[in-house]
Design a protein with these regions (language model features):
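Beta-propeller-forming repeat regions
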Residues: 29-408
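N-terminal secretory signal peptides that target proteins for export/translocation
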Residues: 1-11
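Bacterial N-terminal signal peptides
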Residues: 12-26
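Generic cytosolic/nucleocytoplasmic N-terminal low-complexity/intrinsically disordered segments
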Residues: 1, 23-25, 29, 274
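Compositionally biased regions
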Residues: 8-10, 26-28, 156
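Generic alpha-helix initiation/capping and coil-helix boundary signal
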Residues: 5, 14-17, 92
């Protein structure tokens, strides 16, 4: 399997470098024209989660991250809550910022979760978004890497899917009046681990849940039992693990990164004598801390790509922690059977970072304006110009990457 590095766009397909996917040596040519424009929303923000919605009902997409929301288009900051540090001070208790009108009042609230307090909460929009927002507890299932909303039942009503240590579960908002009611659905914990995703794995039209240990088959009946299939081992995987038919052979493949190591991989699904066979192949091994992946059609060619990159200081002590930060888009060329990579952003490493990981601080160690993927990104058309942009949080700041496809 080969990986092609694109220098201008996936539209022009200008090849500047080819490497064997099983190799580890990489070199990159300078890109002559930018495909993306980086905007600083708050280069001093230390939070790693983000949500995008119209919080002030003016028709523009705003950004929620950590303790504040930022009003489009000039990103005026409005602090609306306090977010404590975790017992490990390198992290804040904001591991998800998922926008949803929880109480049905027409204003967008935020669903959040935390690792150290083990809590899921919703942050209520007060009506005037510039006033303090109100935190309401939902549950305390365990330490969570992050969580996200997914329309699991394709009903238009998303569920909250958290990555909980030792458990696999999701939460449905089953009632808004007269009182909010969240219904947790516990699945067999055999598949629990670092990493979580979804996709129609068996092509039956229903969305399944993917974990590092296998996948859970959604039953035909909403109240039926979810069947766990322990068909693979992914390791300490990303959130999300993406289930999608990348190669166009009518079955769902799986793509994931190593959240705390080097490596971006895919499992190609095929059938042999009627049985499912998963073939593991390396996509890229040139960067580490591949913690967040998101699917979108960034180049408007009708096929889905995914964005990922380096979560800066996912753990300060990990291999590659001080290497150059990066955000990349990968797409699969079905004609050549190659993965293509295009740069959204590549920064500078932090060679002067303290040798003691406990003394490291992303805002001090990396150059101002350095961007990574954080725990989650938002992929939305931020400027309403017809193409998908990227909002990326992290310990080194909060940034919007404007897609220049339409403007070129």
């Amino acid at each position: 399997m080969e990986l092609t590095i694109l220098s201008r766009s996936f539209v022009t397909r200008l090849i500047v470098l080819q490497i064997l996917a099983l190799g580890t040596s990489k070199s990159f040519s300078q890109e002559p024209a930018p495909l993306w424009k980086k905007h600083d929303i708050n280069r001093f923000s230390p939070y790693e989660a983000v949500g995008v919605a119209d919080f002030d009902n003016d028709g523009k997409l705003d950004v929620f991250c950590g303790d504040s929301w930022y009003k489009a288009p000039d990103w005026e900051q409005h602090k609306v809550r306090d977010v404590p540090r975790g017992t490990n001070p390198h992290y804040h208790e904001d591991f998800a910022d998922a926008p949803l009108d929880v109480n049905g009042d027409g204003n967008i609230d935020i669903l959040t979760c935390a690792y150290f307090s083990k809590a899921i909460s919703w942050i209520e929009h007060p009506g005037d978004p510039k006033q303090p927002w109100i935190t309401h507890p939902i549950d305390q299932p365990g330490s969570m890497e992050t969580g996200y909303l997914v329309d699991l039942f394709q009903s238009g009503k998303p569920v909250f899917l958290p990555n909980v240590g030792g458990q696999v579960l999701f939460y449905e908002l089953v009632d808004q009046t007269p009182a909010l009611q969240w219904k947790p659905r516990m699945l067999d914990p055999a598949g629990a681990g670092h990493g979580l995703g979804h996709g129609d794995v068996n092509s039956d039209g229903r969305i399944d849940i993917i974990t590092p240990q296998g996948w859970y088959e959604q039953p035909a009946s909403r109240d039926g039992a979810w069947t766990f299939h322990p068909e693979f081992q992914l390791g300490a995987a990303s959130i999300e693990i993406i289930g999608h038919d990348f190669d166009g052979d009518a079955d769902t493949d799986i793509v994931w990164g190593m959240g705390h190591d080097f490596g971006l991989y895919w499992l190609k699904q095929s059938k042999v004598d009627g049985k499912t066979v998963w073939t593991k192949e390396l996509i890229d091994s040139s960067f580490s801390q591949v913690h967040a992946l998101h699917l979108a059609d960034f180049d408007q060619d009708g096929q889905m790509e995914f964005v990922t990159g380096k979560r800066i200081y996912a753990h300060e002590s990990e291999a590659g922690a001080t290497a150059e930060p990066c955000v990349y888009i990968f797409d699969y060329d079905r004609t050549s059977s190659k993965w293509n990579r295009s740069s959204v952003y590549v920064g500078q490493p932090a060679p002067a970072a303290p040798l003691d990981p406990e003394k490291r601080d992303a805002l001090k160690d990396f150059r101002p304006g350095s961007a990574g993927t954080g725990l989650q990104m938002a992929v939305r058309d931020m400027d309403h110009d017809g193409d998908i942009d990227i909002v990326a949080p992290g310990k080194s700041g909060l940034y919007w990457f404007e897609n220049l496809l339409i403007k070129r």
